[in-house]
């Protein structure tokens, strides 16, 4: 499940393996 702005691939997972919010949406990290 992707949570947050869908402008980039999921870079972070919670302990359940779900996408977590990516506040650097649209930026290279």
Curated annotation (Swiss-Prot):
UniProtKB keywords: Disulfide bond, Glycoprotein, Nematocyst, Secreted, Toxin
Note: Negative results: does not inhibit voltage-gated potassium channels rKv1.1/KCNA1, rKv1.2/KCNA2, rKv1.3/KCNA3, rKv1.4/KCNA4, rKv1.5/KCNA5 rKv1.6/KCNA6, Shaker IR (with inactivation domain removed), rKv2.1/KCNB1, hKv3.1/KCNC1, rKv4.3/KCND3 and hERG.
Disulfide bond entries: 7-19, 10-25
Protein name: U-homostoxin-Hdu1a
TM stretches of this protein: none
Glycosylation sites: 1
The keyword Repressor is assigned to this record: no
Highest taxon in the source lineage: Eukaryota
UniProt keyword annotation of Membrane present: no
Species for this entry: Homostichanthus duerdeni
Family per record: Belongs to the sea anemone BBH family.
GO cellular component, one term: extracellular region
Major location category of this protein: secreted
Localization annotation: Secreted; Nematocyst
GO MF entries: toxin activity
């Amino acid at each position: 499940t992707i949570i947050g702005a869908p402008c980039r691939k999921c870079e972070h997972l919670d302990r359940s393996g779900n996408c977590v919010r990516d506040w650097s949406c649209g930026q290279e990290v």
